[in-house]
UniProtKB/Swiss-Prot annotation:
Taxonomic source organism: Influenza A virus (strain A/Gull/Maryland/1824/1978 H13N6)
Major localisation: virion
Family label: Belongs to the influenza viruses Matrix protein M1 family.
Top-level taxon of the source organism: Viruses
Subcellular location: Virion membrane; Host nucleus
Membrane disposition: Peripheral membrane protein
GO CC entries: host cell nucleus; membrane; virion membrane
UniProt GO BP: viral budding from plasma membrane
Protein name: Matrix protein 1
Oligomer status and interactors: Homodimer and homomultimer. Interacts with NEP. Binds ribonucleocapsid by both interacting with genomic RNA and NP protein. May interact with HA and NA. Cannot bind NP without genomic RNA.
Other facts: Most abundant protein in virion. When expressed alone can form virus-like particles in transfected cells.
């Protein structure tokens, strides 16, 4: 796996699924391929994106700044600086300085990532802030190692909380989660179906599912009534795809 592929993988792992994620993936691909060279416009676009947490925006801004060639005097962006200040905690800043000194001795992406993984997310963000504010310099490879270590930590904590939700025994949470998944699967079906004539059936199934979820939410139902809703939808989607000769496992 190439370095940039690895960076893209880690960065996208912390972006919530949805149309915005696809947009960000495209922007990253363009930047890494040298197709997007307007850093100013890129940062302005990033700043106004909804849904993303300030830290995610800060990390993306840091990656864009590392990758897109820019004039030396280009102004640093406040939204990135604020996100990478380690919540203003002086302990984070102290640890970030220690980490920075260690990173200065590293020359490889993997070496930097290994060193960085033993620090807290706050310290890692502060260290990125140091480099972003030009208070310290490391090679691009080492900076990417720092980025990926930070993303790995964030993705780990997201995964833990996701697992807790999936394994929760609270029937109300499980019920709502099934309905949300059914709703997003229906939305995805509508997108995949596109505008072909054969797509009418898939659109109909998706539309019915969304109406059912809406009705269940409006009148309130027994928590077990949503069991199998998403699976039924996926079965319908896969049957439709087989007929269309399309194979899309990614909704699983």
């Amino acid at each position: 796996m190439s370095l940039l592929t690895e960076v893209e993988t880690y960065v996208l792992s912390i972006v919530p699924s949805g149309p915005l994620k696809a947009e960000i993936a495209q922007r990253l691909e363009d930047v890494f391929a040298g197709k997007n060279t307007d850093l100013e416009a890129l940062m302005e676009w990033l700043k106004t994106r909804p849904i993303l947490s300030p830290l995610t925006k800060g990390i993306l801004g840091f990656v864009f700044t590392l990758t897109v060639p820019s004039e030396r005097g280009l102004q640093r962006r406040r939204f990135v600086q604020n996100a990478l200040n380690g919540n203003g905690d002086p302990n984070n800043m102290d640890r970030a300085v220690k980490l920075y000194r260690k990173l200065k001795r590293e020359i490889t992406f993997h070496g930097a990532k290994e060193v960085a993984l033993s620090y807290s997310t706050g310290a890692l963000a502060s260290c990125m802030g140091l480099i972003y504010n030009r208070m310290g310099t490391v090679t691009t490879e080492v900076a990417f190692g720092l980025v990926c270590a930070t993303c790995e930590q964030i993705a780990d904590s997201q995964h833990r909380s996701h697992r807790q939700m999936v394994t929760t025994t609270n029937p109300l949470i499980r019920h709502e989660n099934r309905m949300v998944l059914a709703s997003t699967t229906a939305k995805a079906m509508e997108q995949v179906a596109g505008s072909s004539e054969q797509a009418a059936e898939a659109m109909e199934v998706a539309s019915q599912a969304r109406q059912m979820v809406q009705a269940m939410r409006t009148i309130g139902t027994h928590p077990s009534s949503s069991a199998g809703l998403k699976d039924d939808l996926l079965e319908n989607l896969q049957a439709y795809q087989k007929r269309m000769g399309v194979q899309m496992q990614r909704f699983k």
